A protein has these predicted regions:
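Bacterial Sec-dependent N-terminal signal peptides
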Residues: 1-24
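Intrinsically disordered, low-complexity N-terminal tails
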Residues: 96-97, 104-109, 119
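Cytochrome P450 substrate-recognition site 1
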Residues: 114-118
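Helix-centric, low-specificity signal for extended rod-like, repetitive segments
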Residues: 12, 37, 57-59, 124, ...
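Aromatic-lined, polymer-binding surfaces characteristic
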Residues: 107-111, 121-264
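Extreme N-terminal leader/anchor segments
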Residues: 23-100
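Extended hydrophobic/Leu-rich segments
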Residues: 5-11, 43, 63, 178, ...
Length: 264
């Protein structure tokens, strides 16, 4: 094998293994959408013809072309970022994630992100990791600077989180239990990653992140389908696992209404 060919092989290999999971088209997204909604005629026609790759491209074009979108949590025409959020965004690029103000400096979760890393055995630290508090600052940093590195890394981390945090069915009462050390792996992890309160946080924040990163080349048609399928999974999960009472229930219900009214 000559040096040039060897270099190409190694580079190709690095592209596949060095940055985690590749984005993939989720054709089930079309069954979750109202394809009779005004503006989605091309999407519907392409999907019915079995051209889902083209349909996904048309769907992304539709979202990017909209001009009447209101995002209550941020003014897209006047995006600013403070020093603290800029730090969270820059640290996030290196997988040093701002999770909790009570645990500073923030912890690094590894080049190959370990979403189950638990440096201090405090449930709040593990729960709040899954609120992704650095994602919106990364979006602001992207829009203010125009630097694609923020969008590229966000898309990578978003897909990485999906792949490494599968939703395992469990009784909703288990989400609030203190770990006794007997439950391990995915079953233990789902208690933290998919607790309804954390899911509702993501449900609200991702409406803002969607708009912030939408113009990016890293926001591909395939990524769009993964995003929408995951977003739908979040909403369905909350509907089946509302907290019984208290402020958690209030927040979960509020964010469901919020997500519906935003109409991604």
């Amino acid at each position: 094998m000559n040096k040039t060919l060897k270099y190409i092989v190694l580079l190709t290999f690095a592209c596949f293994v060095g940055k985690g999971y590749a984005q993939e088209l989720k054709s089930e997204v079309f069954s979750l959408l109202n394809l009779d909604y005004p503006g989605l005629e091309k999407v519907k026609a392409l999907h019915q013809e079995g051209k889902d790759e083209d349909a996904a491209k048309a769907l992304l074009d539709y979202y990017r072309a909209r001009t009447n979108v209101k995002t209550p949590d941020i003014n897209l025409k006047k995006i600013t970022i403070g020093k603290e959020e800029q730090q969270w965004a820059d640290d996030g690029l290196k997988h040093t994630f701002f999770v909790h103000k009570g645990y500073q400096p923030s912890y690094n979760y590894g080049e190959d992100i370990n979403w189950q890393y638990w440096p201090v055995k405090d449930n709040e630290l593990r729960w709040q990791l899954h609120r992704h508090k650095w994602f919106t600052p990364m979006g602001k940093a992207y829009r203010v600077s125009g630097d694609e590195k923020y969008a590229k890394e966000w898309a990578y981390q978003y897909i990485d989180w999906i792949k490494k945090n599968p939703l395992v069915k469990m009784d909703k009462k288990e989400y609030e239990l203190v770990s006794d050390g007997k439950i391990k792996g995915e079953v233990e992890n789902v208690r933290f990653a998919w607790r309804p309160l954390e899911v509702s946080n993501r449900l609200q924040d991702q409406t803002t992140q969607f708009q912030l990163f939408l113009p990016s080349p890293s926001f591909t048609p395939d990524f769009l389908t993964e995003f929408l399928v995951n977003y739908h999974k979040h909403a369905v999960h909350i509907l089946a696992n509302y907290s019984d009472q208290g402020n958690h229930l209030l927040f979960e219900a509020q964010r469901m209404i919020y997500a519906w009214s935003i109409s991604l």
